[in-house]
Amino acid sequence: MKICFVTKERLSEFWERTGGEDADLIFFPLFDDVTVSYERELKGETAYFEDVALLSKACGCTVVCGYNTSTRGIVRSSAVVAENGRILGVSDALSSIDGTRNCGAFLKVYETGAGRIGVAVAEDAYFPEVLRTLAACGSDFVL
């Protein structure tokens, strides 16, 4: 399996520079300056999720992108998972070490062509029970 870890570029910068990547999975970490408003996405004022889906379709692979949300005063750290042009779901961080973000409610394992992906968002990576739970739920690997 080929995994492309994009560590310095945002999704739009990466896509403009490369036009995509020959990989089974493209992973963008959580950048503090990437914030998505679900309200604006639903109104069509922004297109972050659409861009994630389009990149996954153009590359024929799974794309996982971290981002922050700010909707009606509720701030979360999240990740969106897309495959072949379709959004598979959104995972929110369950943990907040400094209390500056709200926490999500559940963990999810995504069935993809790249395998069963468990998503640990932001500070969740510091809590072994999150990783153990994703493994117990059948993840082939955890991002």
Positions of predicted regions on the chain:
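Enzyme catalytic cores with a strong preference for nitrogen-chemistry domains
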Residues: 1-143
